[in-house]
């Protein structure tokens, strides 16, 4: 069943939240029929919390370390998401696994973005600059970005959307990362727009 528009988004982030900012900018510009309901960070010093404050979105720090266990984090996160009326959970640089209670409550309603063309160069430990180092080490001629549904396994859920990025001669991991990030900032808001308009049916994936 299509998600009602505007999408009621809850963000999960760990650090800078630049993908989240791209989505917030699209909402503010009227290009994405969505509402940001809450930003949850497991890192109290995450810039994503400051981005949330500037955008007028409630921000919340929740971590297993502060709450005492992964189970307590899972419970608290689900309570916060439900309490803010979230219909779609959007991971934006969230460096932890999403807990089983949240996944059970939001079946096919948790999205993540990965800086490669999954299933290549994904899985545990494949994040940040490591992904681009692996792409170059493998001699790939192209890489890209994947938006996918989240399940219990890292970078494993059904693919929602992908965009390709050519690997240039002489690319460094840092140069490739910068170009891929630009594509992330375009693909994530566009994919959410297509979901909001019913062009992508998450339940059909």
What kind of region is each of these model predictions?
Residues 1-205:
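One-carbon transfer enzymes
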């Amino acid at each position: 069943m299509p998600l009602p528009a505007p999408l009621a988004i809850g963000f999960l982030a760990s650090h800078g939240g630049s993908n989240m900012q791209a989505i917030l900018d699209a909402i503010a510009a009227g290009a994405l029929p969505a509402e940001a309901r809450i930003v949850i960070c497991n890192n109290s010093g995450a810039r994503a919390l400051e981005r949330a404050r500037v955008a007028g979105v409630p921000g919340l720090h929740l971590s297993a370390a502060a709450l005492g266990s992964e189970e307590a984090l899972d419970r608290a996160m689900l309570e916060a998401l439900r309490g803010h009326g979230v219909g779609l959970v959007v991971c934006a640089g969230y460096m932890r696994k999403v807990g089983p209670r949240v996944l059970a409550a939001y079946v096919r309603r948790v999205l993540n973005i990965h800086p490669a063309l999954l299933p290549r160069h994904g899985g545990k430990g494949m994040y940040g600059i490591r992904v681009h180092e692996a792409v170059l080490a493998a001699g790939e001629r192209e890489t890209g970005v994947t938006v996918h549904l989240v399940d219990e396994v890292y970078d494993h859920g059904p693919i929602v959307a992908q965009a390709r990025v050519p690997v240039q001669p002489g690319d460094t991991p840092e140069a490739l990362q910068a170009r891929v990030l630009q594509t992330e900032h375009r693909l994530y808001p566009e994919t959410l727009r297509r979901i909001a308009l019913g062009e992508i049916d998450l339940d059909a994936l």
